[in-house]
UniProtKB/Swiss-Prot annotation:
Gene3D superfamilies: Phospholipase A2 domain (1.20.90.10). Binds 1 Ca(2+) ion. The active site is at residues 48, 92. Belongs to the phospholipase A2 family. Group I subfamily. D49 sub-subfamily. It is found in: Secreted. Expressed by the venom gland. Its main location: secreted. Its EC number is 3.1.1.4. This is Basic phospholipase A2 PA-10A. Its cofactor is Ca(2+). Ca(2+) binds at residues 28, 30, 32, 49. It catalyses: a 1,2-diacyl-sn-glycero-3-phosphocholine + H2O = a 1-acyl-sn-glycero-3-phosphocholine + a fatty acid + H(+). It comes from Pseudechis australis (Mulga snake). Keywords: Calcium, Disulfide bond, Hydrolase, Lipid degradation, Lipid metabolism, Metal-binding, Secreted.
Length: 118
């Protein structure tokens, strides 16, 4: 679920940036998404959105699905339990790892999505 995703982000980035900083970044980080991602971090969010879409097509509810995971050496590791839980956990873990590698450009936080995300 979204709280677990937030915790995974903190695991992967070693707590260097609050999870909320990703909630309104670029065209895809946060609710919804459209247009072309503005940078590598925004592409991470688009891939995560697409992964959640795939989870939904499998009958899962990714924003609400609780799963089991551990933070081992600043790497989120999923503990498989069921199809939906494992799929959603994998979406979140991949995004958290992607966020940790991608540069954060403050200029892409809280952008005007109506003009920048076409």
């Amino acid at each position: 679920n979204l709280i677990q995703f937030s915790n995974m982000i903190q695991c992967a980035n070693k707590g260097s940036r609050p999870s909320l900083h990703y909630a309104d970044y670029g065209c895809y980080c946060g609710w919804g998404g459209s247009g072309t991602p503005v940078d590598e971090l925004d592409r991470c969010c688009k891939v995560h959105d697409d992964c959640y879409d795939q989870a939904g097509k499998k009958g899962c509810f990714p924003k609400l699905t609780l799963y089991s995971w551990d933070c081992t050496g600043n790497v989120p590791i999923c503990n498989p339990k069921s199809k939906c839980k494992d799929f959603v956990c994998a979406c979140d873990a991949a995004a958290a790892k992607c966020f940790a590698k991608a540069p954060y450009n403050k200029a892409n936080w809280n952008i005007d999505t109506k003009t920048r995300c076409k």
